[in-house]
Amino acid sequence: MAEKQQAVAEFYDNSTGAWEVFFGDHLHDGFYDPGTTATIPASRAAVVRMIDEALRFANVSTDPAKKPRNMLDVGCGIGGTCLYVAKKYDIQCTGITISPEQVKCAQGFAAAQGLENKATFDCGDALNMPYKDGTFDVVFTIQCIEHIQDKEKFIREMVRVAAPGAAIVIVSYGHRNLSPGEESLKPEEKKTLKKICDNIVLSWLCSSADYVRWLTPLPVQDIKTADWTQNIQPFYPLLFKEAFTWRGFTSLLMKGGWSAIKVVLAVKVMAKAADDGLLKFMAVTCKKSK
């Protein structure tokens, strides 16, 4: 495993336990109505809503006659998305992550929910997945590609394992699209993004226009994007409120160590960058050509 991948695996191995109070068995942001006040109970509902909104955006049908046969979650965390989709759609779900600790957690959650035969989890490399071409009816990833250096290869690998007609769904942080005439972000913007990436072991962030550019030459159709930045912003004040108390700080430190504290420090920067229009939270979807 490459040094960068090992760092990502260790980051999640060390910090995963710190976030269960907010997210349960999920490790991604929640989807809120803009301007609402988030609470811990609401945050657990919001992470599930994020999955529903992403699948709805990709036109994944809940009709029993039209529903997908199976789904792959690339960067599956501790299995929350797979378990939710397996139960809701009554389909086979597979998750892949580079963190052995996350695989163990996901398998434990599956066993606790009686879903061992519906949801399976593999430890592996998202750039070289151990699945045959055209295997999955939905290929889903949320807040994983930010960790990947070769994002274009990551997307090609997602398309490879997607079946003809499959929905491909990417939900991720990124940055604003460049304005006409701009060749790159401003130096101070690059500095801000580097600070975020360094604290939470991200490789680099791209724009929704980059995703469209990488997808366009591939055998896909119906590419579309959405900006969901306003839908995640209500969580930031909740995290600050809970983390910047003695009880919250010590809990994060005990359960997640310095890795968890660095996430909180990064989120302070992320909140301002989102307010400034630099940081974006986006959804991208397309269909594998038949």
UniProtKB/Swiss-Prot annotation:
It catalyses: picrinine + S-adenosyl-L-methionine = ervincine + S-adenosyl-L-homocysteine + H(+). InterPro entries: Erg6_SMT_methyltransf (IPR050447), Methyltransf_11 (IPR013216), MTs_g-TMT (IPR025774), SAM-dependent_MTases_sf (IPR029063). Residues 71-80 are annotated as: SAM motif I. Its EC number is 2.1.1.-. Residues 161-170 are annotated as: SAM motif III. Keywords: Alkaloid metabolism, Membrane, Methyltransferase, S-adenosyl-L-methionine, Transferase, Vacuole. It comes from the Eukaryota. GO terms for cellular component: plant-type vacuole membrane. Its main location: membrane. Residues 134-142 are annotated as: SAM motif II. One of its GO terms (biological process) is alkaloid metabolic process. Homodimer. Belongs to the class I-like SAM-binding methyltransferase superfamily. gTMT family. This is Picrinine-N-methytransferase TMT4. It comes from Catharanthus roseus (Madagascar periwinkle). The lineage of its organism: Eukaryota, Viridiplantae, Streptophyta, Embryophyta, Tracheophyta. The gene is TMT4.
